[in-house]
Curated annotation (Swiss-Prot):
This is Uncharacterized protein MJ0678. The chain crosses the membrane at residues 107-127, 131-151, 169-189, 200-220, 228-248, 260-280, 299-319. GO terms for cellular component: plasma membrane. The lineage of its organism: Archaea, Methanobacteriati, Methanobacteriota, Methanomada group, Methanococci. It is a multi-pass membrane protein. Keywords: Cell membrane, Membrane, Transmembrane, Transmembrane helix. NCBIfam families: TIGR00341 family protein (TIGR00341), uncharacterized hydrophobic domain (TIGR00271).
Length: 320
């Protein structure tokens, strides 16, 4: 059972009492501490109940000078006995997911350095036909973050996060393509290279693999299951096909390069489509009631867009 420890810091004179909070559904333990003019409400709950408790605290104290902080306890004593009930999927709360998405969609110096290193490693792995180097570039997975963040921004109708994700994604795509084109211009690139040939040969399995890995990646994000994240990064790698696209353009193989671009688009669409569907299925939505309908509308539009693009690519592969 995954737990969360919630603290809500509020002005002392606004505190409404702890007895009502202790009666809330999902509260395992609750207490209040007062220090000067600040009262701190402390609540121990399960991960699956934490979002509704945070929302209730927002309703009670949202208009005040308050601050909610959520921790993940490493242990608690006495042990908590789990009640036998219908098992529900556990996921991170909305705010936790938002913080993760905002961080991975940030065009920071650190993220750009990781992008430079992973692109260089990917180019070297492709050129030398070295699978180990390619896997290393996939694990870094710099292009995965903005796509996940974009999908979450649509699900919660957050335009600032959407714009931030799109800007970061475009900047990273342009950088990878330009760096790969420069490398392709100076390196002796051959279409017989196994790593290049495998990324310009498309079939129906490309879509199946991309969708499967996209779903697994979305589940690992929403459930915070890090054990499958590495496998997902390798299975749905965005960087190698994009690097192959740039290398072939730089080497003058313009016509052949578009197959690698299509493979990249298949993977990117799969990530976004899977993420939106999984986020919606797990009940992730805006906190404000007036944004919920707006989020549902844009989620539907996004799903229709990604499905349409998938069908178009599928037809393109058949008649390619």
């Amino acid at each position: 059972m995954k737990l969360r420890f919630i603290e809500c810091h509020i002005p002392k004179h606004l505190f409404m009492g702890i007895d009502e909070i202790r009666e809330w559904d999902g509260v395992i333990w609750a207490n209040v501490k007062t220090n000067g003019t600040i009262s701190t409400i402390q609540i121990l709950t399960t991960l699956k109940d934490s979002e509704k408790i945070v929302d209730k605290l927002k309703e009670m104290y949202g208009g005040a000078n308050y601050r909610v902080v959520v921790f993940e306890p490493t242990m608690t004593y006495p042990p908590i006995e789990e009640e036998e009930e219908k098992e529900e999927p556990e996921r991170l709360i909305r705010e936790e997911l938002y913080n993760i998405a905002s961080d991975i969609a940030n065009l920071s110096k650190e993220n750009m350095l990781m992008l430079i290193l992973s692109t260089i490693v990917a180019i070297a792995g492709i050129y030398k036909d070295d699978v180990a180097l390619l896997i290393a570039s996939m694990i870094i997975a710099p292009l995965l973050g903005p796509n996940i963040a974009l999908s979450l921004s649509i699900t919660v109708a957050d335009y600032k996060l959407a714009l931030k994700s799109i800007k970061t994604l475009i900047a990273e795509l342009i950088f990878v393509i330009i760096l790969s084109m420069i490398a392709g211009h100076y390196l002796p690139i051959s279409l017989d290279n196994p790593q290049i040939h495998s990324r310009i040969t498309l079939d129906f399995w490309s879509i199946i693999i991309a969708l499967s890995a996209g779903i697994a990646g979305s589940l690992s994000t929403v459930s915070n299951i890090s054990s499958i994240a590495v496998g997902v990064m390798i299975a749905i790698a965005l960087l190698p096909p994009l690097a192959v696209f740039g290398l072939l353009i730089g080497a003058g193989y313009v016509e052949q390069s578009f197959s690698a671009l299509i493979l990249f688009l298949i993977n990117m669409i799969a990530i976004n489509l899977s993420a939106i569907v999984i986020f919606s299925a797990y009940g992730i939505s805006p906190y404000r009631w007036w944004k919920k309908e707006e989020a549902r509308k844009y989620t539907l539009y996004a799903i229709l867009l990604w499905v349409t693009l998938f069908i178009a690519i599928f037809v393109l592969i058949i008649y390619h």
